[in-house]
Amino acid sequence: MNAKKIQLIAIYLLLAMGVRAQQFTLSGKVSDQDGNAIELATVSCLEQGAMTMANLKGEYSLKLQSKDSVVIRFSMVGYQTKTRVLRRPRGDQKMLVQLAPMEALKEVVVTERRRQTTGTEQLDVKNIRQTPSTTGNAVEELVQQQAGVSTHNELSSQYNVRGGSFDENSVYINNVEVYRPLLIRSGQQEGLSVINSDMVEKIGFSSGGFEAKYGDKMSSALDIHYRRPTRFEGNAQASLLGGGIYVGYASKQKVTTYDQQSVAKFTMSHGLRYKTSRYLLGSLETKGEYDPNFLDYQTYITYQPNERWSLDIIGNISENHYNFQPTDRETSFGTMQNVKTFKVYFDGQERDIFRTLFGTARLTRHFGKNSKVSLLYSAFHTKEQETYDIQGQYWLDDAQTQEQLGVGTYMEHARNYLTANVHSLKLMANHKAGRHDWEAGVTVKWEKIEEKSREYEMRDSSGYSIPHQADRLDMIYSLASENDMRSTRIEGYLQDTYRMETGGEKPWHLTLNYGLRMANWSYNKETIVSPRISLAAIPSWNEDMTFRLAAGLYYQAPFYKELRDTTTRNGQTVVTLNQKIKSQRSIHIVGAFDYRFRMMERPFRFTAEAYYKLMDNLVPYNVQNMKVVYYGENMAKGYAAGLDLKLYGEFVPGTDSWITLSIMSTRQTINGVSVPMPTDQRWGVNLHFTDYFPGTERWKMTLRLAYADGLPFGAPHRGLEYQQFRAPAYKRADIGMSFLAVGKPDATPSLRHPRVWLGIDGLNIFGISNVNSYYWVTDVTNHQYAVPNYLTGRQINGKVIVEF
């Protein structure tokens, strides 16, 4: 037995030595064309399933099995992928590789597959034009499909993030914060957003735990960067819901920057968009003459005379008109055993105008490739008018017994006017020093807002005015506001991104971002301090994994709407501005896990994020359709906790698809009573799926599905404590089919060789009646009935897109 054991051990050792002899070690360095190290570059051998990442010096080491030929792949976001073949490698092999920048490619497509080492996720803008759309705001609709984000109105481009309101989301274009109109109360009134998707190069989105450079909002940050054209380019599109044209130009004169990039000395982009939702609004239950017209023009101009100086200018003009003359409406609602019908005949009309001007200018001085200082000026002006006089005679009946449950007349009146001007001056600096990436900024904002509003609603039920008083005649709702606000806001931040790695043969790659933000507002004489920190770790034992942790103290600095406090006497509500209001406050803790893997020989990524937000100094609010009405006082505290899951990848080769699942609980305590927040969506599922017809890339399909829990609601003009009901779940499916009629899918379009897409979109293809809000009918006994206001039905939209 001992001899046999010795023989077995000897055979095993010989086999092990043979296997070891077939292995080899590949090491070297990955750099750019100037010899600078490319940190975290990926070095892989796909056929052996082996992969590693270069360290912060660009150095790498990888153990592989020796074969007749071994294919090695070097890749990094922003650089061309390079492949090398080794013939019968043995022992230790050295390989130095230089990667060329992507600018040398004919067409650059930036995808979402790069490693996420901060709280900001890079979203893919590829094929955004082929996605079915109801609002014409493709970027916001892309954000609405992300994990933790929800919307319950396909007519609006606004969104809620992890239980926050519409006003808790900051939006930046080229480092300048942008604003939205203040009087918008419904999705029908919304026009085109300030973001022109044809001009977008990069989209960064954070649903929590974002960096100090992003402003004082509690929910999310959307960071948009516009593209500098590299040649003459453009597109034109038309559909039943509107159209637009975009043209970009780059001069032939080039400038070599400090980082050895060749850029055009002068570029300009122009975009003109038109939107009309008349066709879409025709599917609503309220019939009438809809006349919405939304027009938007935008330009982006850059000038860089030399490597030291550059100038960027953005200009935007938006003119939105919404005119509506309702005629009648008939709604059936209730259960199968208890069906009710609500019928209304209307008189009157609504006429709204939202006119917006926005512009920025940025002058940048470059001090080498690692340092620059920028001075930015921006101006925002909006003039808004909302006027309507609408009278309706209504009947509420039991559909089975024909019993009349309510009959009456109501009159709604509004004369709302608002003018707002915001000017800002910002000085920001960027400096890279070794493994540190510093950024700092100081902003001064001058704000001026004037409002004059008068609203009332009168109801008469069975000959009695509601609410019925024996000694006086009261309106069910009456509001008056005449206010003027002038203020100065000073903001500043300092942050650093530090990249490091642990020691050892297989180090951990760490990215630490930390910063401090401060702000002072002259109106309430408040100073806020917001520290923020995040850490991302790529473990040595699996470089396809990333662990992320973020924490910070976040504030929601009040703007005009949060200041509007109300007092009611004898049925008349008067709006005053609360000068003692404080910023809402939230402590964020976010833990995340990313895992990149291959399935069906295609790349995928799974992301899980758990979060908890502890909030105080809250200003409670009601949501009436799309209008957020605040209490005007810091009188609540609350929390939001949840889990967001996302699976992203190529379910079909060469396409991007994803599915998200969000679970959330958010509550607030008002006057000792715990109630769900108005945006308490307990769960939500989103699917974005892209496919090609078998055997061809000319036919393309995009499917969008949304299934989300309903939101809490209650009778209007009452406190949140009485929101004891929950709306039905929001369910919607949109599908878009596109056919490339002219041109080649893989060729860059031009004036001589354009690409022409023909498309058809099925909007709400299952014809699901989603509830937008409720109209409350009150009889003389003060019994109330909630009549649902349904959103759009099934519609077909045709479109043509020409790219050149």
Where are these regions (language model features)?
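Face-selective signature of the C-terminal outer-membrane beta-barrel domain
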Residues: Q304-N320, Q349-N524, T607-A610, W658
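C-terminal beta-signal and adjacent terminal beta-strands/loops
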Residues: Y707-P716, F739-F804
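Short, acidic Ser/Thr/Gly-rich low-complexity loop/linker segments typical of extracellular
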Residues: G49-E59
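Periplasmic N-terminal accessory/gating domains of Gram-negative outer-membrane beta-barrel systems
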Residues: Q80, R87, Q93, R115-N169, ...
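Short, acidic, small-residue-rich periplasmic hinge/interaction motif at the N-terminus
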Residues: S31-D34, A41-L46, R73-Q80, P89-P132, ...
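Transmembrane beta-barrel wall of Gram-negative outer-membrane proteins
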Residues: L241-T276, T286-Q325, R351-A379
